[in-house]
Swiss-Prot record:
This is Elongation factor Tu. Residues 10-206 form the tr-type G domain. The gene is tuf1. It catalyses: GTP + H2O = GDP + phosphate + H(+). Mg(2+) binds at residue 26. It comes from Polaromonas sp. (strain JS666 / ATCC BAA-500).
Amino acid sequence: MAKGKFERTKPHVNVGTIGHVDHGKTTLTAAITTVLASKFGGEAKGYDQIDAAPEEKARGITINTAHVEYETANRHYAHVDCPGHADYVKNMITGAAQMDGAILVCSAADGPMPQTREHILLARQVGVPYIIVFLNKCDMVDDAELLELVEMEVRELLDKYDFPGDKTPIIHGSAKLAMEGDKGPLGEQAIMKLADALDTYIPLPERAVDGAFLMPVEDVFSISGRGTVVTGRVERGVIKVGEEIEIVGIADTQKTTCTGVEMFRKLLDQGQAGDNVGILLRGTKREDVQRGQVLCKPGSIKPHTHFTGEIYVLSKDEGGRHTPFFNNYRPQFYFRTTDVTGAIELPEGKEMVMPGDNVSITVKLINPIAMEEGLRFAIREGGKTVGAGVVAKIIA
């Protein structure tokens, strides 16, 4: 049962902690909730409450994720923290927890480590737009020059993956001290600095309803005397009666006009993001539209067949493949509402991909799909999910 009423007075932003194992992601998450709860209200969470992350399923993949919330003076944040590295990989690739920005936690005592690099790369591949750095465990480093060196390394690493290293806020602190109630510059003050960086460096995300209209086609009906009705859930934007729309994907792009919007058998003058609607199309035949296409604002999205992506391949225990796959593997790619066959090209020097791996791939589909960078997909074999992925870059 929900505890207390959710006050939607402050704008809402989704964030999460990323970084190498044992650099203090979960301790920092606990410290943020504790310090901000004392300043702005909300619930303080202890390390153990966050570490015991519940299992959840996203696209058939089991992921352990802890969700906490906290408030700053200006905003309400939903924050995700994952216990294990594999959970991060799955979470970011499936988009189970979309992040408007990430807090990269890096230990000042160790400097950047392999997963620090991998999480920055993943953030770039899956389209996390902003990263803020929390240099943790600064209480364990007495040498100011060493701190400067670690900070330089982190900035170089961010630059390498196309994040603005020089402009990125880097906060020095100690999550452990903050948890212990230390009011000094590395304790509570560092957490308040981090909160300020979240408020100022991460812009408010565009609300789904403000985007360009897009609705994946789920079903198509023909209603005698009225024409063709397409049903689906509006993903973003607003559709008004009388507006021109395009049908994109699989076949050649067609133009049509929305002559009616229905919801729960009632006629509306518009449908918006989140609504399950039926859209009546003027002059469009039933056979001109099929599941897997999208209705969209003209010119807002194009069909593509060739792209690079980042994928996670399910392990045998997760119900995935039992054997590796090789170059030119041809599974089905499930985009929004339909499967399209495609061929996978592995990166140079990569012989094969084992179940449980994540890898960057290049894909050529046999039919075009309405696609943008950041679009999620599942990889299937005979209707069974064997992987999950995200479009990193469109080639053609």
